[in-house]
Curated annotation (Swiss-Prot):
Molecular functions per Gene Ontology: transmembrane transporter activity
Tissues showing expression: Highly expressed in roots.
Activity regulation, short description: Inhibited by excess of xanthin, uric acid and ascorbic acid, and by 100 um N,N-dicyclohexylcarbodiimide and 30 um carbonyl cyanide m-chlorophenyl-hydrazone.
Lineage: Eukaryota, Viridiplantae, Streptophyta, Embryophyta, Tracheophyta
UniProt-recorded name of the protein: Nucleobase-ascorbate transporter LPE1
Length: 527
């Protein structure tokens, strides 16, 4: 055995900017790469859009036509909101799409007893939609106030790398129930998709020099095309003709209901279902989801900043981004998207898979969202891709997003018992508490908090059902209180590495990555 060289024992250097990218936030790739990677970002967020509509619309009494319009509306607003965030928000290459966090309060509003007397399904759909719109508008106002008034800036100023690790990690890991459990709904389609994606993205791209572009840049697209054709062959061969309705829904590639229900051309517009209905308890329920979504978006944006090659966001930039996210949710409520907008976790993972963190790519993906929403018939064809294929993609993409949280450990002293305590307790309870809330509701039909106030029940159950939110609260409080007075704590928690980014003017790279376009920074300066 050869002796170990001294240089091999040197500790890995700390990297404030992720070095494993081919194109960073300010370096756009060639146009062919830009278009192909941008289309993949659209394809990835499409799965979330279809899943949200599939869960909520039938509960409201809507059919295929209503579901198609909702999908079209979510896509259109996602494109608009992504452009707003990339141009005027954080300016990070983050896709803004529908958030899973809003599903819980949305379902609670839909199942409210006051709608039980509505017999006609379409009438029930319209009334519940209008109630959701009112609640979303209030939730958006809350986020806009928190962002634009600088309240979130105060939170970020005291955030250390140690406190950020748990909730950035659980922003990805906390969505595990949308990943492999979705694959198992049609294992003969989902599992091959998962295996192919891993082979193409992580093995073939390094082994085959001639096909490196296809595998490194288009692994998701190639995987989806191959498995979609495979699913079409299984469907045409009658493999699911004798299976149950649940299996057929998950596996069949000819879900023509969405295609038939979609118009050829349609432009979503504000209040297309009528004027919003503002109900006190509905608004409070949605406010809790807005708070949880705010934390999850922050975790996702930290992951995006890593995978785009940018430095850590200054607090004022984070606050600006959250403010624009609030504006996005208000637009969602006006047009009727069922759920609010948040930074897409899966698209953050796609930045790592493609190694392309360019801002221009995300702008192109937003244009794809808008195009396929306006020409809804074409978008409906892609929306008919079996959901287990998307679930297979999420197994890799959510994991990569979680990996961005692990990368922050480079700033921390892992030989400190304080560090181990904060990391372990926040990660463990961040997974354990939400799992308890989910299992409890699965068995009893309601959450552990079950008082006479429905709004209070939903608020508490929503917050403690979010792994990232639970982890963020625990890690932040523990990091800011436990042994805070000891001299070594600042170094152990990685505070000195991020101290230069706590003000916009302390590091020149902040101006390079986060300044507003069109000279707007002169009129809206960052602090």
């Amino acid at each position: 055995m050869p002796p170990v060289k001294a240089e091999d024992l040197v500790v890995h250097a700390v990297k404030e900017q992720f070095a494993g990218l081919d194109y960073c936030i300010t370096s756009p790739p060639p146009w062919i790469t830009t278009v192909l990677v941008g289309f993949q970002h659209y394809l990835v967020m499409l799965g979330t859009t279809v899943l949200i509509a599939t869960i909520i619309v039938p509960l409201m009494g809507g059919g295929h036509a209503e579901k198609a319009i909702v999908i079209q509306t979510i896509l259109f607003l996602s494109g608009i909101n992504t452009l707003l965030q990339v141009h005027f928000g954080t300016r990070l290459p983050a896709v803004m799409s529908g958030s899973y966090t809003y599903i819980y309060p949305a379902v609670a509003i839909i199942l409210s007893p006051r709608y039980a007397l509505l017999i006609d399904p379409l009438e029930r759909f319209v009334f519940t939609m209008r109630s959701l719109q009112g609640a979303l508008i209030i939730a958006g106002v809350f986020q806009a106030v928190v962002g634009f008034f600088g309240i979130w800036r105060v939170f970020i100023r005291f955030l250390s790398p140690l406190a950020a690790v748990p909730f950035v990690t659980l922003t990805g890991l906390g969505l595990f129930f949308f990943a492999f459990p979705g694959v198992t709904k049609c294992i003969e389609v989902g599992l091959p998709a998962l295996v192919l994606l891993v082979i193409f993205a992580e093995y073939a791209s390094h082994l085959f020099a001639k096909g490196s572009f296809v595998f490194s840049r288009c692994a998701v697209l190639v995987t989806v095309v191959i498995i979609w054709i495979y699913a079409e062959i299984l469907t045409a061969a009658g493999a699911y003709n004798e299976r149950g309705p649940v299996t057929q829904f998950s596996c069949r590639a000819d879900r023509s209901g969405i295609i038939q229900g979609s118009p050829w051309v349609r432009f979503p517009y504000p209040f297309q279902w009528g004027y919003p209905i503002f109900c006190f308890q509905d608004c409070f329920a949605m406010l809790a989801a807005s708070f949880a979504s705010l934390i999850e978006s922050t975790g996702t944006l930290i992951a995006v900043s890593r995978y785009s090659g940018a430095t850590f966001c200054p607090p004022s930039v984070f606050s600006r981004g959250i403010g624009w996210e609030g504006i996005s949710i208000i637009l969602d409520g006006m047009c009727g998207t069922l759920t609010g907008t948040a930074a897409s976790v899966e698209n953050a993972g796609l930045l790592a898979v493609t190694r392309v963190g360019s801002r221009r790519v995300i702008k192109i993906s937003a244009l794809f969202m808008i195009f396929f929403s306006l020409f809804a018939k074409f978008g409906a064809v892609l929306a008919s891709i079996p959901l287990p294929i998307f679930a297979a993609l999420y197994c890799v993409l959510f994991a990569y997003s979680a990996g961005a949280g692990f990368s922050l450990l480079q700033y921390c002293n892992l030989n400190s018992l304080r560090t181990k305590f904060i990391l372990s307790i926040s990660l463990f309870l961040g997974l354990s508490i939400p799992q308890y809330f989910r299992v409890y509701e699965m068995f009893f039909g309601f959450g552990p908090v079950h008082t006479h106030s429905v709004a209070f029940n939903v608020m508490v159950n929503v917050i403690f059902s979010s792994p990232a939110t639970v982890a963020a609260i625990l890690a932040y409080l523990l990091d800011c209180t436990h042994l805070y007075w000891e001299a070594s704590v600042k170094k152990d928690r990685g505070w000195f590495w991020w101290e230069k980014f706590k003000s916009y003017k302390y590091d020149g790279r902040s101006e390079e990555f986060y300044r507003l376009p069109y000279g707007l920074s002169r009129y809206f300066p960052s602090l």
